[in-house]
Structures are given as C-alpha cells and as structure tokens.
C-alpha cells in the first residue's frame, strides 16, 4: 500500500508539470506547490517510527527583496493542506490528515535558477489511531526546513531537509512526541502579482 501511494503521488507530481508560465518569487506574487516527503524518528521511545506525508501549498510573497548581503530575500506566508499523513509505528499504522495554517518562509534573492529558502511551520494532525501509540489521535506539528527551489522554464522543483516534531501538547498523558528528520520534494509554480 505504501509503495502504491508513493507511486501515485510521484506520478501526480510529474503530471502537474504543465505549461504554466514560470517566474521567480516576486513581491505581491503567489506560490502553488504539490509536495511529498517522509522520514524516520530520531530519538527516544518513538525512534523506530517513520512518517510519510503529502499535500499542497498556497503562498503569498509579502515583501520586496530586502536584507544585507547573502541574507537578502523575500518573506512569504503560506498554508498547507495535508490530506495524506501516515505514521508507521511498531504496533500499528496510523492514517491521518492535517492542516498547516502557519508557514513562514524566507526565499533568498539570487540571480541563478537556484533559490534557497528557510522555513518554519506549524499545524494540526488528526489520525485514525493514537500517535504515538497509547496517547492521542489529535496532535500538533511544528517543523523547520532548509531547502531550495530549482527554477525551470515552466515549473519550480523543490527539495528540502526538514525537522518535524509531532506532539499532543498535553491533550493526553504520556506525551512522548515524535521527532523526525524528513526529506521533502515538490513541484510548483510562482505566479506574478497584480500591480496597480
């Protein structure tokens, strides 16, 4: 089932690379991206857990480029819909969905096709069984990522390395949480903003 889901997600990513005009991140512009990622637990009682998730993002590039030297870039606010979130636990497999209403992203300004970024995000996750096992089926997610967009003629590919923490924030006891390191890939488009 996992391989089938991963194959379908990958095929959808490839099929979405249609002829939409590609631009760089611009102030007043927007980003739309379809992404998928996964990783493994890093420590503690949940170190043997693994995750796979896939979703879509819509973002608003809120600023013109500013900042000194290599830190110069544009600030973006985005939201993620996460219809696929799977947690592979030793006892069972959890299927869920989530929503990240807060994604804060800094797109560094470059003259090349490579646009590095850093990101902080937070959201909520609902699963069919408790995550971690014996805790809660409602959890909160926080993540930090470093990655890059690779700008093509029609689409922008992205890849990032992400640290994600999943926790019930005290809704249930115990609250061991799951800490994962993930790799995420995506395909998306930057749309020009409307200027008056």
Feature map (PLM): residue ranges:
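Transmembrane beta-strands of outer-membrane beta-barrel proteins
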Residues: 30-34, 73-81, 116-122, 142, ...
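Short glycine/proline- and aromatic-enriched beta-strand/turn motifs that initiate or cap beta-hairpins
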Residues: 21-63, 180-196
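Short loop/turn motifs that connect adjacent beta-strands in outer-membrane beta-barrel proteins
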Residues: 21-29, 63-75, 109-115, 151-157, ...
